Swiss-Prot record:
Keywords: Cell projection, Cytoplasm, Cytoskeleton. Disulfide bonds: none annotated. GO terms for cellular component: axonemal microtubule. This is Ciliary microtubule inner protein 2B. It comes from Xenopus laevis (African clawed frog). It comes from the Eukaryota. It is found in: Cytoplasm, Cytoskeleton, Cilium axoneme.
Length: 311
């Protein structure tokens, strides 16, 4: 008895076209309002039902590549974007007009375009990038031509030979290898520290941005920094005059003298160091029970053995 088999393509087993296969993530009209069948049978019924309004194309963008802009063709675009000139300039032949969706590589200037399909966005981005590269190349050629003309390496045309020419070419040769530097007779002359200037001197102030400490400046407000520092130094000088202290007598500073006196000693014998001094003080780690200034007083005048005993 002969055994009969069903045909390989049976309408019972195969879903008739058109239909979508499971996993399709695109839009299907009226799919969210239908149920009771498999995905293939349900989409086949929705796509063939004349009562359901739908598009005439199963895929809205039937052409995988966007239409070329007006005045261009794919042959011209292929020569521009995929031709020899582009590969020599960019060095990457992967960027063509037929960019497939899902490409994870970098496409120059693609972040500037949106609200279009992937192929259209890639087309616009590559066209914009190619135009920018051509502009930069033309600027580079123009700079090379200018350099050749200035150095005399560009051969002259017949028309240029008939023009009036100058006796000298740029750049002009230097007259001396070591020219004498220019010194202005009215140049700025440093006048020394503002602390040692007279009160009537208009330069007795610190410019804005000075981060050093200015005595008495924290108590003056309501004026600009130069005016504040001027008043602070004048007030500080008056306070020292009442105590019998003058900067000019102590430091031996003369107006017009730019040399500052060097202080070779760090540890003063008469005074202690200010708090938060981070340098080394001999014998300080063996002392305790007094202020920092008292413990660091006369650091060089006492030996380590003497400083172990607190006065």
């Amino acid at each position: 008895m002969a055994v009969t088999f069903p045909p390989k393509i049976s309408p019972t087993l195969m879903t008739p076209d058109p239909h979508f296969i499971p996993g399709y993530s695109g839009f299907c009209p009226q799919y969210r309002y239908s149920l009771g069948k498999t995905y293939g049978q349900l989409t086949s019924h929705l796509l063939t039902n004349p009562d359901i309004r739908r598009s005439g194309h199963l895929v809205l963008q039937s052409n995988p590549f966007p239409p070329a802009p007006r005045g261009h063709s794919y042959n011209e675009a292929s020569q521009e974007l995929g031709g020899r000139r582009r590969r020599q300039r960019l060095g990457d032949p992967k960027l063509t007009i037929s960019m497939i969706p899902g490409y994870t590589g970098f496409i120059p200037r693609s972040q500037k375009f949106f609200a279009k399909t992937y192929a259209e966005t890639s087309w616009d981005a590559l066209s914009d990038f190619h135009n920018e590269q051509q502009m930069q190349e033309s600027q580079r050629q123009e700079m090379l031509l200018t350099s050749k003309l200035q150095e005399g390496r560009q051969p002259q045309t017949e028309h240029e030979k008939q023009l009036l020419t100058a006796r000298h070419r740029t750049p002009l040769p230097a007259l001396s290898k070591e020219p004498a530097p220019f010194m202005s007779l009215r140049g700025f002359q440093p006048q020394g520290s503002p602390y040692y200037m007279e009160e009537e001197n208009p330069n007795k102030y610190f410019i804005s941005g000075y981060t050093g400490y200015v005595p008495r400046s924290r108590f003056l407000i309501g004026n600009g920094y130069p005016i504040t520092t001027n008043r602070a130094m004048v007030e500080f000088a008056h306070m020292n005059q009442k105590k019998g202290v003058r900067f000019s007598d102590q430091q031996g500073h003369n107006e017009g003298d730019n040399l500052h006196t060097e202080q070779g000693q760090i540890y003063l014998e008469e005074l202690g160091l200010l708090p938060r001094y981070t340098g080394y003080v001999p014998g300080y780690k063996f002392q305790f029970g007094n202020t920092f200034g008292r413990l660091t007083q006369n650091a060089l005048g006492q030996s380590t053995l003497q400083k172990q005993t607190v006065n």
